[in-house]
Amino acid sequence: KEEVTLIKPREDTTQVNNYEYDQSVVCTGAFSKSLVRQIEGRFIPLETERGYHIEFIEKQELLSRPISLVESGIYLTPLHNRLRAVGTVELGGLHSEISQARIDYIARDAKRLLPSLQDYQKPWLGYRPTLPDCLPVIGKSPKFKNIFYAFGHNHLGWTLGPTTGKLITDLICHGSEISSVYSIDRYLS
């Protein structure tokens, strides 16, 4: 695994190697902001939503299907020998510490419904790339004809990733058009 630290019009630099390419797609989710700044020389208002979940290791099945605690926004999903509890989101950037208060909130509500739950394991925090208009950036760099963008899908990255991949592939390989509503120009002009 290598982290891209610099993108130039025909070369990517990682911590280990330099790679030359004909085209490059910046599809690094919440980590796209700094790469766009290097490439375009401009700031984009990409923020990081941080979503939390915890897991309870359980020997017996406590739920037969996923459920939602509507009033608190917590969701419980049974998995093999464990129960995942998810909920809460915050705008917190990439470098802030995990919020123990948010973890405790999820645990408290899960235990309110299922008092027999053991102590939670594996607190987790995920980064979701979010733009002010809630639309992703999909399309060409206005500065370099061989650099393309595909990021900013909020909570729907896994859901929209395949469609975005198809759009970018068609753009690069066939010159297909992508609606200007997804253009990075909306933040650079």
Segments the model singles out, each with a brief description of its role:
Residues 1-15:
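A conserved short coil-to-beta-strand element within the FAD-binding core of flavoproteins
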Residues 2, 88, 153:
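Short, well-ordered beta-to-alpha junction loops that form the rim of enzyme active sites
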Residues 6, 19, 23-145:
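Active-site substrate-recognition segment that forms the wall
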Residues 12, 131-134, 186:
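Short secondary-structure transition/capping segments
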Residues 14-16, 85, 148-150:
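Generic recognition of long tandem-repeat/solenoid scaffolds
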Residues 137, 141-189:
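C-terminal lid/capping helical subdomain adjacent to the catalytic/cofactor pocket in oxidative enzymes
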